[in-house]
Amino acid sequence: MTAVTSQSAESLARKGYSVAITVASKPRERAKMSTAEVISKDETKVVQLAEELLKKCPPSKTSVVDFLGAQYDMGLAWVHFPVGLGGLGISPKFQKAVNEVLYPAGAPNPMYRNPIGHGMCGPTVAEWGSDAQKKRYLRPLFTGEEIWCQLFSEPGSGSDFAGLSSKGTKDGEEWIANGQKVWTTLAHLSRFGLLVVRTDPEAVKHAGLTAFVVDMQAPGVEVRPLRQMTGEAEFNEVYFTDVRISEAEMLGSPGDGWRVSLTTLMNERVSIGGSMPQRGSGSIASAVNAWKALSPDQQDSATRDELMKLWIRAEVLRLTNIRANTTRKMGTPGPEGSIGKMAGADLNKETYAFAVNLQGANGMLYGSYAMTRPETAMAFDGVQKAFLRSRANTIEGGTTEVMKNILGERVLGLPGDVRVDREIAWNKVARN
């Protein structure tokens, strides 16, 4: 017997799960409970649900899609989302309790199947989408049946995202999109994309943007690979030529594109730089393994000291990310997520460089630079590839220079850069 809220009981019962209503699910009685009692009830509830999910859908005997679908239906996808939309309507901090039950048991991690969708687009659709959009998109996004991409950066507006020039023109009940996006991760696999275009060129640049969900298989959408120094092409450039988008696919209202994109970007920076791996995992694990592979006479004190400095930085970053994730899981991702993104990018580059250097001449050997189209953006395929791939960490998801501006202005309260185009209509701003 599993304890759930009264709202979710009916929907779970229809799917064959045994349910009961807890005293804590009754608003009046819940209001009388102490904070500690509510937390205890909620954590017990999600742990019980997670354990029941493992019993009904053993990861070793259940397909990834079926398991994640059942996880979504039980409200364990994003626990803070509403009932019926992958959540239980409780505090997002209890997602950690769910993950701590599921992942050690071998449950699939949705981030590996659909990193952009799960970490960035899903929260944006949940925040800004219509009821119909939430019901249509969130479940297959979580299961990975429909991969998503983020269509923000352009050749002339990467760091200056608000200056983008792709156009959206209204035509009856549709909008027609034209323009080019670049550095679009996994666009070649994506079924849908989160697209921001300029719909009012006479407004100031931040005010004239509108966001849409776009069908990546629609006529007029062309995806071209961008080959990276690893030999792969996980990034793409995407061209839109008279692509028709229903007005029903708008996120928010016309002109809300900047605010919609901030939701995405705040989640992106926590998603990229604010993950909470176990102590000693990630890039620092590669450095430790490279150290262990050395012969005793090569394990000198200077190299050990360098490794320990990297370890300490990795641990400081891990603890900082825990704090940033706590803020996000309370429903308020903020600019502090830029700390993890910036520090993590620099640390990855230095740590993988250290690991490669320890291998000596073998560190220069790389299997193949053959052009490939990866099935995920998160696969690890050796230290050499990780070293090459880490070069992009200080660029993707916002450059380190942009992160420093965000931290200086929004966290430290320092004066902002002089922006002469802040109050000028976009179509009046001089361009090269």
Tell where the protein language model's regions lie, with residue ranges.
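Glycine-rich beta->alpha junctions and the first turn(s) of the following alpha-helix
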Residues: E37, V221-T320, N393, N427-N432
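C-terminal helix-coil-helix/basic helical segment that borders enzyme active sites and/or dimer interfaces
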Residues: T62, S301-R304, E315-E375
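A short, Trp-centered hydrophobic/proline-enriched beta-strand micro-motif
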Residues: G144-F152, V196
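Glycine-rich phosphate/pyrophosphate-binding beta-alpha loops
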Residues: V182-A187, M229-T230, A392-G397
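A short core secondary-structure module
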Residues: E173-E174, N178-R224
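Amphipathic, small/basic residue-rich leader segments at the start of a protein or domain
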Residues: T2-G117, A126, A132-R136, P140-T143, ...
